[in-house]
């Protein structure tokens, strides 16, 4: 028997490429995104009461890892990609039905939009369902996992003055807190800042929305998040 499911919305994420995404949610608290709900879930009725919740579970599709033939064994990155395990013993993206789940922080609730942080989702990810995180039920005090018994190791990031300047410029261009993202990322997601080829600028819209506050989703798209109008650039001076 087969079942058909349809997305209730899509995530607009700061992660545009799958190879830069943290392996688990909450590893990069500064990673932000917006879940844009589709009709009929975009009227506000479906999210009424959700403002009382701090975190939510997102059930989603690994839309860039869907396969016709299911894999019985996978090579999880945590084991260096050299050891295979049964797919059900891992959180690998290659799932029998392409389903994933992440618990993320709910920053703000609006009709048709949920503002999120601590995400590990690719831009455009289809979301199948939303469920509130319930601490007394979702926390299992005596749970254990011998495969992943500790968080991934962190690598200290030492910023030179030039790297800080570049991070600031890229942060303004991308409307993302680059320094915080790099500092909170897991080893797989760390990247060396590169020289900017354009002057730093902030993206603003005629509707008055400013997107370079470090708390809003990226403006690396052709329209404003609020009113869907094309953005304009406003030059800013770098801050050390």
Swiss-Prot record:
Annotated positions binding S-adenosyl-L-methionine: 22-24, 63-64, 91, 122-125
Gene behind this protein: rcsF
Protein family: Belongs to the tRNA methyltransferase O family.
GO biological process entries: methylation
Keyword Methyltransferase: yes
NCBIfam families in the cross-refs: tRNA_TsaA
Name of this protein: Putative S-adenosylmethionine-dependent methyltransferase RcsF
Pfam family, one: TrmO_N
GO molecular-function terms, A-Z: tRNA (L-threonylcarbamoyladenosine(37)-C2) methyltransferase activity
Keyword Glycoprotein applies: no
Membrane spanning stretches: none
Organism, as annotated: Pseudomonas aeruginosa
Residue intervals of the TsaA-like domain: 5-142
Keywords: Methyltransferase, S-adenosyl-L-methionine, Transferase
């Amino acid at each position: 028997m087969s079942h058909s499911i349809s997305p209730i919305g899509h995530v607009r994420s700061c992660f545009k490429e799958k190879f830069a995404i943290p392996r688990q949610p909450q590893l990069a608290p500064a990673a932000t995104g917006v879940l844009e709900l589709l009709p009929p879930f975009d009227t506000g009725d479906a999210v009424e009461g959700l403002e009382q919740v701090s975190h939510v579970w997102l059930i989603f599709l690994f839309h860039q890892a869907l396969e016709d033939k299911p894999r019985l064994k996978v090579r999880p990155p945590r084991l260096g990609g050299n050891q295979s395990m049964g797919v059900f013993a891992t959180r690998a993206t290659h799932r029998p039905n392409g389903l994933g789940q992440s618990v993320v922080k709910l920053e703000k609730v609006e009709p048709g939009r949920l503002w999120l942080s601590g995400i590990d989702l690719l831009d455009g990810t289809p979301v199948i369902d939303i469920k509130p995180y319930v601490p007394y039920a979702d926390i299992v005090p005596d749970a254990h996992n011998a495969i992943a018994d500790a968080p991934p190791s962190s690598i200290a990031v030492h910023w030179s003055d030039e790297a800080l300047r570049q991070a600031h410029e890229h942060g303004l261009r991308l409307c993302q807190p680059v320094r915080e993202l790099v500092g909170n990322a897991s080893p797989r997601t760390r990247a060396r800042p590169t020289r900017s080829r354009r002057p730093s600028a902030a993206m603003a819209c005629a509707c008055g929305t400013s997107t370079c506050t470090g708390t809003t989703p990226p403006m690396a798209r052709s329209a404003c998040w609020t009113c869907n109008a094309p953005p304009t650039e406003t030059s800013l001076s770098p801050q050390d």
